Amino acid sequence: MRLCDRDIEAWLDEGRLSINPRPPVERINGATVDVRLGNKFRTFRGHTAAFIDLSGPKDEVSAALDRVMSDEIVLDESEAFYLHPGELALAVTLESVTLPADLVGWLDGRSSLARLGLMVHVTAHRIDPGWSGCIVLEFYNSGKLPLALRPGMLIGALSFEPLSGPAARPYNRREDAKYRNQQGAVASRIDKD
């Protein structure tokens, strides 16, 4: 059962759940909290690689990822990031989120943006128990027009679901946690699997 708005506010008040900066009550809806777009992005460079062998030797996968991923792009608040049709880009939420070991989060895109072709997460919308950091967004423009995305705009909504008990291996305590405390648009670390 997901937390309702009253429970989300109570968990925030009690410090069991942390969203920083804390959203105003107007952004806490029936069962979700609206989140905004941060100012950090990462794109794919133009490249000539025919493919990336995701299960190949780790050093080759790492080198291939370094060749195709851009450095992090940091925008001023007044600037826009343009996502063209058929492009994939990474970004982050403005808010940093910390979940306790007995709560899982879910990220959903906004229907109004989806109707323009913007996918906010390609597949990864679960936020693990014990997570702490900004949420990486996997943008894909499936529409026909470039989309101007600006830091601070409403980009998605988080919902929260209590677990039957605290996780034995929450994300923040796992040795293999590749994205612990991320604050930027961190590229894939599949080579660390």
UniProtKB/Swiss-Prot annotation:
GO terms for molecular function: dCTP deaminase activity; nucleotide binding. GO terms for biological process: dUMP biosynthetic process; dUTP biosynthetic process; nucleobase-containing small molecule interconversion. The keyword Nucleotide-binding applies. The active site is at E138 (proton donor/acceptor). It is an enzyme of class 3 (hydrolase). Keywords: Hydrolase, Nucleotide metabolism, Nucleotide-binding. It catalyses: dCTP + H2O + H(+) = dUTP + NH4(+). PANTHER family: DCTP DEAMINASE. This is dCTP deaminase. It comes from Escherichia coli O1:K1 / APEC.
